[in-house]
């Protein structure tokens, strides 16, 4: 934005009344900002869309309960991360931007790049990786693509938002080094390299401060350190104290909560709790964004090339699928052999997750409908098992008979819809048992089983010996079926590599004893040892390591050259098929003074090679290659030493190793190894209070609920309420929640309410409920029924009257706002 434009926006802000300034910082509807007609400041439209646009045609709601317009459903972020292809990410971003523009969407709420701290997070399908470097690079590519079409990307959720349980009322207790190195680095890359113009703050607290009110996070780090010059948007209903948010650097509270927050802002300016300069700065940043997104904007093409985007979704899915196993080269399929296709997922594919990201696709392929397009000898097809876990004995017998008479069985299975959803964490890593029972029975009558997996996060795989081949599609979008068959038939050579580790069991995971949380807090005792950083350092054997994936060809590595600013390495396709390899560069410092993982991903490159072709690749070092966060000095530093540079096909398959000397700039090391023995070994599953306190640098907050409930306590905490009515409501909500789970489809509305704090009632009702009324509700819950009812009734009429007054003020009718 040029200087003249900036000055013009400043003049606009100067012309605004305080009522207009306060009002514009909260939404007008579920998805729209507030316009100021008097000054020709228009409204803009925000929409979900990490992997497809979810613009609702009618009344808007946060969780997608009302139908949305048709849009391309691309593979989810967890899937695309397995491609390790930034060019592909940018291409998908461009398509998302085109579709958003065609629907007059100004800000696309994505991508999501929270770290996969635990496989149990119900929203892992929306996130890229357990590794911040890979997450950041892939997010930056999406952002560049989206914003090239005149639409803002809004990466989310800043920060440390790694669980769904009580996500709006949870305090993440995490040390500053872990925060910086693991949970903020991906966002740093997204801002610096993707040049994101919007950021969504997370629901949770970070060390006792709500992310949206954390000035250290939103101003000191985001704006000053990273150079962010866009707007910060709350997650929907995620504003706790709007005044504190504005002071900290947050620009837009969503969705609409009427004028309650605006009145709070005005009162805060009048009583000196909020500087008017801070208010003007937030308004100026928001107005800059609004005018940039709307000024001189051409009428967008209401149509996008649906077929081209479908083919892009197919290409993306094919490049992101991982071949985990291929014994005796059973794949690609021999077209002469008879094939039985078994599994409900072949008829009703699971191609996306549940929640606010759910897309209404332009079309959806399923394997059963498109098999005839391929030259395959299909003996027959059947579901074999019931999606909801029930057993149909006739269908099961038919499946076994079909398998017995076929040369090869394609078995389609995975996690069902209730297993992964926004608002709901998983309780285990297992695939539904009825699917595994059938798989094991089939393996007794046919040893040639090809397993086709659908799941948005890591799963336990004790049954893997039943399959000769396993192709993992993750949640591969609307064109996933054709992408799967392209790989099975050899039309496409698989090149996906895991962006997360697959442990043998959940009990192996580093946060096993700490996840998801205590009642009020979630303690990040595992520190920097997340994912492969833990397994690799503590020598824990896993099922499939980070970065792993097979191909129909073979690659060799040679001629590693380590230079001052990067490495060069030659890669050769030694097989008989064209294919792609993901070359991964890891860095470690043996015998480091400051504890650290044995190796960390610091660079990667995907290269396409014809059979017999060789190519030299260059992977540069950057400002993140050797750094660590020194909590003692509060800055990034480099430790002096001989660093190992390890190049390979996965974290466990290092082909070439070299060293480089680095002179550090440490001004004093932060830790006493004698007080932190387990952090220095990486064995972090049983960290004591004393050792975590040493890492954290403060007393550990009490994570238990106690005393009466407050506005920031979750509604599910009404289990402890003094009011019988409140406890009855809790039991009803719990019963409804369990009923939806038993039916195999999560009730997103119930899940959202269940984990929502009481203040969310005011933030999510469009101005119908004020904070005064919420305090009345809490009084009633705590047993003060009459006092609560009095506040609710009085608050209702005062809120209604004050909202009408505010409307008149904005329309220029005069009067004062209370």
How would you describe each model-predicted region?
Residues 1-624, 642-647, 651, 763, ...:
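Glycoside hydrolase catalytic-domain context in secreted enzymes
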Residues 652, 658-728:
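Charged, amphipathic alpha-helical linkers/stalks
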Residues 694-818:
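Long, low-hydrophobicity ectodomains and other hydrophilic envelope-associated domains
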